[in-house]
Amino acid sequence: MAQPGDPRRLCRLVQEGRLRALKEELQAAGGCPGPAGDTLLHCAARHGHRDVLAYLAEAWGMDIEATNRDYKRPLHEAASMGHRDCVRYLLGRGAAVDCLKKADWTPLMMACTRKNLGVIQELVEHGANPLLKNKDGWNSFHIASREGDPLILQYLLTVCPGAWKTESKIRRTPLHTAAMHGHLEAVKVLLKRCQYEPDYRDNCGVTALMDAIQCGHIDVARLLLDEHGACLSAEDSLGAQALHRAAVTGQDEAIRFLVSELGVDVDVRATSTHLTALHYAAKEGHTSTIQTLLSLGADINSKDEKNRSALHLACAGQHLACAKFLLQSGLKDSEDITGTLAQQLPRRADVLQGSGHSAMT
């Protein structure tokens, strides 16, 4: 049987909100920190038990600014779990509204990871600063853009109109983030109330349109094209366009959208490498994407600047099912610029044998 004051038992009582049993246990033991660096206040705030929180703070004088091993305070816990009554109580007792945990996250940032407008309002009304950034350069508005609740974005723009003028340390904007996660209604808010450049690039040269396409969010891509003037042929830092990035991620429907509906050249090349979408799909081993590209008229014999075919990239990546499909579709092996055949690249020399196709063109 657990001794009075056992940390695990105390924490369990707090988690379950059993205030009466907790009082008896603490009175017998004289108080005790919770496990793993958490105080019982952390546990109470995390699980939303305001009555337990108040009892611990008032009857036992527990420090509402105590930190755990991640430097989280009880306010971080309450905010991140969406417990508005606990947030209000802690703020009412003078908790620091913009306290920082590891990685420089404030309670407001943590609240913005959930779709709980009430908690966000509570924090802002008590002076939380939406413009503060964490170690990755994200402010609360940027974090909210990842979650995609349009009401929260509208609220943050109302109380802090300049919150949208932000980018992460790798130059990604809230528009990039909302587009990547496919939040159509959030993107509509960003296009209506913010002034993002249509083809603003992050450190890798990626635009919001590329993000939408490579993640398969065709509705967002269409909106960016129709309402924001995004450029279909914009290139990333390696010269790859949206079509190429869709091939990398295996987004077949997005590829059909680009080629069949928008008229993008299925064999367009990345400027720095001369790779086509077929090359990119083969490099990643996406057999279904290769099928899609071929059905749209892709040239199976296209070569890059090193005279490599899609077969070379499939074999180099050890994507043997993909390589066999290319051979079965009529692609013949050939030497690249160094005289290397694709069949020389797999780790097992026999893997392409029996395909029924000659090794050389």
From Swiss-Prot:
GO terms for biological process: tRNA modification. Its main location: cytoplasm. ANK repeats lie at residues 36-66, 70-99, 103-132, 136-165, 170-200, 204-234, 238-268, 273-302, 306-335. It comes from the Eukaryota. Keywords: ANK repeat, Cytoplasm, Nucleus, Repeat. Signal peptide: none annotated. It is found in: Cytoplasm; Nucleus. The record marks K102, K135, K165 as: Required to capture Ser that is misactivated by AARS/AlaRS. This is Ankyrin repeat domain-containing protein 16.
